[in-house]
């Protein structure tokens, strides 16, 4: 049995959705198919709800576009007849529900998180019903078995309950199943929640792990993990194999081919992930598994980058030798739901720098200044501020630990090209070296690192995705 996930671009047009039909129907074994909303629909749902909440009557025009996309898609891909009429009626009922919600928001001029989560869930519900009809699959409502619980003001997966419900739901598995991705429900209240941006990948991985699937396939609009963004490096090609660790590191540092939480559930069960292109189904794609076939072939597998980085530094002579400073930093940030993707600390212990997304920078400074208010007042720690408009670059490869000189070559290359490194970090596992530069230096950094490694004895794979445009 396999699980296949198709993203928004894969179901975003008539041609692509018909390609999905051919790919799914070619599978002989039992298959569970997970789909995202039609490409662009989630953004339209969010925009329409915000317009309605602001009292902008033109929200109705946005809503009409949402209706048109789905009605026309059905007309194009489902032959005229009773099946099409029945499907239009079913979709029409959901769209009418959505219309009523938007009207309510417009009247009260308010949009709660609960209502917003409900609205965005319609994208996957609508698309999955259409694809189920198109492929002859049996539709299952993921809200009934993907369960979340609230932690630190965010909804996170209740793994134990979800696994139990997935196994119960699919104890007798039909040959072809269709499931909406991304959406879930709170285990206590039953309210609609979601798994976050990229959550459809996660839905597929959760199901694959719970059912011990033979494989998980992620179908998207690229040929897998590429050696370079062709907008930056023209000699890009597909990376055939990555380890779970390498793929996770690349994804955590900006490569949006696969949603990072997707990897752990299947890694735990040793289920391979195959990333394929819906628009080029014959392509090899990228296989992600525990061990690659030739682990000695490359010291560096890829470079990934995050271009919206803020660096926050907690510093002061009063930190030296004081136990628990870092604990307080990370506890305060975690309590407020702020994720840290880079940590750099001076050996003298008088400063700790953390990398966060620009959107989290102001809140991070606020909570840290509050946490260390006493030390700041006494002059032991300096007032905490964020340095914004930065970028983080990470080179990744499990075999760096076996290859001396990688860090020297990396920073030597940057120095010779006049690129200043603001902060850097390397884990003890030696699977990645990450560093922070001014965002204006990002493109140059990627190019010179590529040239230095690719044209040398070390074969380089490069990934740089600066602004994710993936669907749910």
Predicted regions and their residues:
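Charge-rich, low-aromatic oligomerization/scaffolding segments with amphipathic character
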Residues: 360-376, 441-458
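A structural feature that tracks compact, well-ordered secondary-structure segments
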Residues: 315-317, 322-345, 395-398, 404-427, ...
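A glycine- and small/hydrophobic-rich beta-loop-beta segment
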Residues: 263-265, 270-273, 277-386
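Nucleotide/pyrophosphate-binding catalytic subdomain
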Residues: 1-259, 263, 436-438, 457
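Single conserved hydrophobic/aromatic residue that forms the stacking wall/gate
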Residues: 463-472
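Conserved short beta-strand edge segments in small beta-sheet-based binding/regulatory domains
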Residues: 375-389, 424, 455-462
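A generic structural motif
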Residues: 349-358, 393, 430-438
């Amino acid at each position: 049995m396999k699980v296949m996930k198709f993203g928004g671009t894969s179901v975003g047009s008539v041609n692509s959705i018909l390609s999905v039909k051919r790919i799914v129907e070619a599978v002989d074994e039992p298959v569970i198919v997970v789909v995202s909303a039609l490409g662009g629909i989630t953004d339209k749902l969010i925009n329409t709800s915000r317009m309605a909440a602001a009292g902008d009557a033109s929200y109705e025009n946005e809503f009409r576009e949402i209706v048109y996309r789905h009605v026309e898609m059905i007309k194009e891909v489902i032959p005229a007849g009773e099946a099409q009429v029945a499907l239009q009626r079913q979709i029409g009922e959901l769209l009418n529900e959505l219309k009523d919600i938007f009207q309510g928001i417009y009247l009260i001029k308010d949009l709660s998180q609960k209502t917003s989560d409900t609205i965005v869930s319609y994208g996957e519900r609508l698309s999955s019903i259409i694809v189920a009809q198109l492929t002859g699959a049996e539709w299952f409502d993921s809200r009934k078995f993907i369960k979340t619980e609230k932690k630190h003001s965010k909804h996170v997966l209740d793994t134990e309950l979800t696994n139990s419900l997935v196994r119960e739901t699919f104890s007798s598995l039909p040959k072809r199943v269709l499931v909406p991705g991304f959406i879930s429900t709170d285990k206590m209240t039953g309210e609609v929640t979601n798994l976050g941006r990229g959550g459809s990948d996660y839905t597929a991985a959760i199901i694959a792990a719970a059912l011990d699937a033979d494989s998980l396939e992620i179908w998207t609009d690229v040929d897998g993990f590429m050696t370079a963004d062709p907008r930056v490096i023209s000699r890009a090609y597909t990376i055939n194999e990555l380890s779970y660790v390498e793929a996770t590191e690349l994804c955590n540092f900006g490569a949006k081919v696969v949603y990072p939480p997707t990897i752990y559930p299947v890694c735990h069960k040793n289920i391979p992930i195959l990333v394929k292109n819906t628009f080029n189904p014959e392509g090899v794609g990228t296989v992600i598994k525990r061990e690659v076939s030739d682990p000695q072939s490359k010291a560096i597998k890829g470079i990934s980058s995050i271009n919206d980085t803020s660096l926050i530094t907690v510093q002061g002579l009063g930190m030296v030798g004081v136990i628990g400073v870092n604990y307080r930093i990370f506890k305060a940030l975690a309590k407020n739901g702020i994720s840290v993707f880079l940590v750099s600390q001076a050996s003298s212990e008088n400063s700790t720098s953390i990398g966060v997304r620009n959107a989290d920078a102001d809140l991070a400074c606020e909570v840290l200044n509050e946490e260390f208010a006493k030390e700041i007042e006494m002059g032991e720690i300096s007032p905490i501020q964020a340095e914004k408009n930065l970028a983080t670059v990470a080179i990744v490869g499990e075999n760096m630990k076996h290859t001396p000189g990688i860090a020297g070559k990396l920073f030597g290359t940057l120095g010779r090209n006049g690129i200043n490194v603001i902060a850097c970090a390397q884990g003890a596992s030696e699977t990645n070296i990450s560093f922070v530069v001014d965002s204006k230096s990002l493109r140059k950094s990627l190019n010179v690192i590529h040239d230095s490694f690719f044209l040398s004895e070390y074969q380089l794979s490069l990934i740089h995705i600066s602004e994710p445009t993936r669907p749910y």
